[in-house]
Amino acid sequence: MKKTIGLLCSALVLTVFSFGQNNSLIWRVTSDSIELYHPYFNDEFDGTALNSEKWLDRYQWGGLDFKTRMYSAPEMVYVSNGILTLGADTTSTWYEFPDWILDSNQIKKNQVEVKNNKVQLDYLTSVAFSKQTFKYGYFECKAKAPSGQGLWPAFWLYGGEPNEEIDFMEMKGEKQNQMHVDVHCPNKCKFIKMRGLPFVTKRWGGWLKFNQRLVDEWVIYSGIWEPGRVTFYVNGEVVGEYQGDFKTSMHLIANLSIAVKGGPFAPGINKNTILPNSFEVDYIRVWKNTLDTDYQKLKKEVDFGKEDLHVNKPIKETKLQTKKKFMLRRKSLKNELGFVTSMMTNNQQLQISKNGRKMNDITIELIDMHGKVVHSELISTQHGLINLKPFKKGNYILKIKHLKTVNSSTITI
């Protein structure tokens, strides 16, 4: 007799994922292809402090801005209840710094008063700066950006020398339905030639406007960096593509800063800005496709630890309101539909999550090693569970289907 399982929508259920190479997967879905990615790096922020094996709670170069008297302070970073909180506040504290941070040239240039290695600060901000560097992959962050003029959260990659950078997301608290994407690299590589105008170039990047507010909401900001291009997404919708590559491996960063008058991303805070304030991060994940040489070298499980179904942090549908054609040049980008994630929980449940706007025709099949389809389910919800308890332990093929396109991988129950 064929066993059947229902796809269960769940309430606020806490589960534990076994996020190994075989049991946790993400698929990039387009109208004519399904591409499989495997877990490579992650943090679900389940502990009581930032994981020091994965992150620095300061910038490698110190994090003190002498001009603005702003410092990314470790005490502004904390983890609780499955959330990384990156804080920001004003201050008048005299903060003590080690000699290596106190750059004498910067002190002189900005006329900074130093007393016994102490500097009086105006602002405290925060950062989570990965110790590991990455080159290529799918980078994903589920986060809630704060509202309020001058607040400046970001999710980005930074390569140091020669100062290469990919900004998957930068926001301002006063631009409630907008997000900024950008790249930085030497030799004016971000200036692209305009079609039909061979002698005209335009600086890639800029502000994108959405039909829904992004601040104070849970949003998935992500991007795929592959040879020759970087594709940017918001809640699974492609919002931009940079055609070009970067030489260096990069550190992954989430941070909250404060803009100042006359500086980048001005204006600064005003009397209505609520401080202290924070940028909340639910998770940060890096995925690699099967052909990636870094994934081939990994050969170890990636632990996703505790996680819930995220129904207590639902993703509202967003849509790019104003498309910038020079940032969406390839016609095939219209085929991008979003992402489907599968994860095994500790109590033999398979969680399915959809991140995209046009994926009503996604079907999941579970096939035993004899080729028998033991379960087939049309995915109709953003999050759901498939109960695996009725099945014998062993290997199964997990197949994802969209129209005539199919991809699959082996999972272990």
What is each model feature region?
Residues 293-347:
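Residue-level detector of functionally pivotal "anchor" positions at catalytic/ligand-binding pockets or at interdomain
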Residues 1-22:
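Bacterial Sec-dependent N-terminal signal peptides
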Residues 12-15, 310, 372-373, 405:
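Detector for intrinsically disordered, low-structure N-terminal pre-sequences
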Residues 325-413:
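C-terminal outer-membrane/trafficking sorting elements
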